[in-house]
């Protein structure tokens, strides 16, 4: 008698094309485990990431704007969920493995710092070997979660997480889908948030973006997703040459007007002061590190453990920690 997992694996032989990764053909995990009777290996990966502490913390990590006032600005968690939905849609249309797309998408930003890319740039300056969030995402799932044991994800999921920014020679087509959908998501929702914040007005959008993608967020997303699906074939996942021009203009516009706008850049010095202060404090007083990071310190060294701890903080917790360390406690005098 077959179990639900085996039935799903048989179904994948029909649903997942020759260029996709079928769960039954996975390279497996770093530590061998007994198969689950209900879920495929990639479904288990997605569940493990969703139930991790690092995933829950994404809800309090900045996407673009530091400490925004309002309930509708994106966070690193909402961004991750948007990427996940887009990746499943594209993966299904291209007859790739939706579950692997989902697992990679859910884990792709687990290593992001507090305060978004401003925090990443700060830690890259502070930590000698340098800091890259995609490498940290892999580190989170490999050796930080579960008290240092990691989530023991499948090799395809691990490579996809590492490859989501720069690519990897062993990456799957599912990993390429997630990388493209990551761009589709942040291009559109960062513009939407910038317009909501009054940083950019609709009339300022480059003409090529309006003509090819429209003015509504949903239409822009649909146009880009449709182009990926229509362009990708025979194992090659990408966008058309003419859409690449729009893509490049879109990126350049956001970098000039949103990511590097004077207000955002003006806050970066504060971010570096906060993270540098916390980082140097724990390097000076390693005995104050949480117990979870003592084992990492013994295994990988003090500075690595402190970097892991600081990079995992949420925006609010980093500000709280800075206050606890450097701001004198208020005393009530009667």
Describe the residue ranges of each PLM region.
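Histidine-centered, transition-metal-coordinating active-site segments
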Residues: 1-80, 85-90, 97-98, 119, ...
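Short alpha-helix carrying the canonical HExxH Zn2+-binding catalytic motif
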Residues: 102-107, 180-181
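Conserved short loop/turn motifs at secondary-structure junctions
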Residues: 106-107, 124-125, 295
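Short active-site segment of divalent metal-dependent hydrolases/proteases
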Residues: 111-115, 185
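A glycine- and small-aliphatic-rich helix-loop capping segment at beta-alpha/alpha-beta transitions
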Residues: 116-127
């Amino acid at each position: 008698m077959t179990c639900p997992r085996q039935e799903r694996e048989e179904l994948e032989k029909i649903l997942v094309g020759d260029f996709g990764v079928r769960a039954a053909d996975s390279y497996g995990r770093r530590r061998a485990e007994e198969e689950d009777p209900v879920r495929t290996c990639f479904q288990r990966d997605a569940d493990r990431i969703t139930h991790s502490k690092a995933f829950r913390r994404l809800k309090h990590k900045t996407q673009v704007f530091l400490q925004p006032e309002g309930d509708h600005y994106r966070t690193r968690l909402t961004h991750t969920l948007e990427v996940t939905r887009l990746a499943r849609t594209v993966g299904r249309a291209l007859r790739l493995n939706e579950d692997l797309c989902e697992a990679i998408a859910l884990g792709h930003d687990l290593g992001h710092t507090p305060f978004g890319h401003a925090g990443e740039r700060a830690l890259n300056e502070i930590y000698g070997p340098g800091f890259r969030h995609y490498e940290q995402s892999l580190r989170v799932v490999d050796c930080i979660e579960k008290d240092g044991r990691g989530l023991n994800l499948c090799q395809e999921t691990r490579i996809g997480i590492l490859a989501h920014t720069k690519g990897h020679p062993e990456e799957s087509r599912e990993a390429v889908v997630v990388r493209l959908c990551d761009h589709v998501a942040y291009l559109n929702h960062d513009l939407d948030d910038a317009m909501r914040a009054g940083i950019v007005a609709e009339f300022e959008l480059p003409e090529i973006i309006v003509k090819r993608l429209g003015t509504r967020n949903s239409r822009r997303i649909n146009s880009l997703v449709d182009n990926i699906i229509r362009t990708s074939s025979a194992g090659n996942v990408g966008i058309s040459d003419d859409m690449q021009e729009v893509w490049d203009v879109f990126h350049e516009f956001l970098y000039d007007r949103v990511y590097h706008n004077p207000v955002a850049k003006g806050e970066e010095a504060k971010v570096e002061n906060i993270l540098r202060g916390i980082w140097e404090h724990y390097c000076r007083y390693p005995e104050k590190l949480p117990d979870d990071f003592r084992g990492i310190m013994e295994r990988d060294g003090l500075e690595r453990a402190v970097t892991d701890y600081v990079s995992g903080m949420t925006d609010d917790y980093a500000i709280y920690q800075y206050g606890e360390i450097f701001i004198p406690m208020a005393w009530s005098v009667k």
